[in-house]
Amino acid sequence: LLTFPGKYWKDLTLAALIFTAVTVWMQRDMLQLTQQADNFVLPGLSTASAAILNPGERTLVYFFAPWCNICKLSIGNLSRLNDELHTVAVALDYKNAQQVATFVGDRELKVPVLLGNSQVAAAYQISVYPSYYVIDGQGKVLGRSAGYSSLAGLLWRTQKI
């Protein structure tokens, strides 16, 4: 067991409380757990149109904007998730498909990227980037989060569900 002077425990506790409060605040407008998520067919960045969700398959849906600095740091973690979870990235709030293609190419993303729109953003209640949902095979929200997530954080959130 690590021992820290009392001051450090107070600092760590305060940091944890602030992190938790910010996370809860960022998720306040997102779809609620067990809520039904809409499935949209969207144009793919490098493929034909595809549905966001695959019926019968658990899916991680990661919403990002190509100008988002936090997205730049965290989106690469999607490529390292295991193959047991269908993963799709949905671009929102972009100028054109080339802007998204440049963003994705610079990060060598290996998951399907779909080009979303304001209707998708409204249906999934996206107000901050990045935002992501874990959705079950019947379209119900199992988990949600917003902001930076490390690979360990993504694995923990997707495996615990």
Predicted regions and their residues:
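Short active-site neighborhood of thiol/selenol oxidoreductases, capturing the structured segment around
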Residues: 49-72, 78
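Loop/turn elements at helix/coil->beta-strand transitions in domains of secreted/extracellular proteins
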Residues: 56-58, 83-86, 111
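Hydrophobic beta-strand anchors of alpha/beta hydrolase catalytic cores
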Residues: 60-61, 87, 132
